[in-house]
UniProtKB/Swiss-Prot annotation:
UniProt record similarity statement: Belongs to the DODA-type extradiol aromatic ring-opening dioxygenase family.
CDD domains in UniProt: 45_DOPA_Dioxygenase
GO biological process per UniProt: pigment biosynthetic process
Keywords: Cytoplasm, Dioxygenase, Iron, Metal-binding, Oxidoreductase, Zinc
Keyword hit for Metal-binding: yes
Expression sites by tissue: Expressed in petals. Not detected in leaves, stems and roots.
Chief location: cytoplasm
Function statement: Opens the cyclic ring of dihydroxy-phenylalanine (DOPA) between carbons 4 and 5, thus producing an unstable seco-DOPA that rearranges nonenzymatically to betalamic acid. Produces mainly (S)-betalamic acid. Required for the coloration of flowers.
Binding-site residues for Zn(2+), renumbered to this chain: H9, H47, H168, H222
Location(s), subcellular: Cytoplasm
Molecular functions (GO terms): ferrous iron binding; stizolobate synthase activity; zinc ion binding
Additional record remark: Requires ascorbic acid for iron to be in the proper redox state. For the same enzyme from B.vulgaris (AC Q70FG7), presence of Fe(2+) is not necessary to detect activity.
Protein name listed in UniProt: 4,5-DOPA dioxygenase extradiol
Amino acid sequence: MKGTYYINHGDPLMYLKKHIKLRQFLEGWQENVVIEKPKSILIISAHWDTNVPTVNFVEHCDTIHDFDDYPDPLYQIQYRAPGAPNLAKKVEELLKESGMECEIDTKRGLDHAAWFPLMFMYPEANIPICELSVQPSKDGIHHYNVGKALSPLLQQGVLIIGSGGTVHPSDDTPHCPNGVAPWAIEFDNWLEDALLSGRYEDVNNFKKLAPNWEISHPGQEHLYPLHVALGAAGKNPKTQLIHRSWAANGVFGYSTYNFTPTTQKTD
């Protein structure tokens, strides 16, 4: 594959609202973003947190409805994609070769950070999928190094996607329905500038440098998939902003990025 991606999985209510810009972007994925059909997909999920990197090793992916108090139709959705056990084993091998731990989960399916965006991106559900967890107790550098260890997968036709939320405050954060909250814009702009300028060490150390990161990412698990995708693109990749929109509440940001290796061989 030509690069890695960091996407926003969005709110499950997007299933009922066709006008949402993020949904329209995801629906145009195969036509406008990744034309080539990947052999398999490795998706790093903000909604699977573990102590050490863990991959699901399954033949068929169950659909996990890991959200509460949503309309009944959302709980009827089934994304019946095949699993990618061979990819899971390769992820385990690459991480352990890099001196990291990796565990295998033989039961877990796909949570909504995985199946929900993929339902719009690849509605055919015919591409093998492997899910990788994040470690909220770790930092950006750890997740970048996880991605770096996985960069050889790009040469094997694997589409690597980090799925989270670029600005993802807690649910009780005051909304800004008449626009976008200034603190959210400031964080989003800082992240864009750091990525497009190649200041990847700053991105890895966002807790020391990014304005308003505490409110933008109180748990950080929704940003760490970005670090994995960034690391997986190899040394000094080129970053491109490929989508930007905001939730109607003015506090959840959906900026989406592509990380392209600067050489044919990643490292």
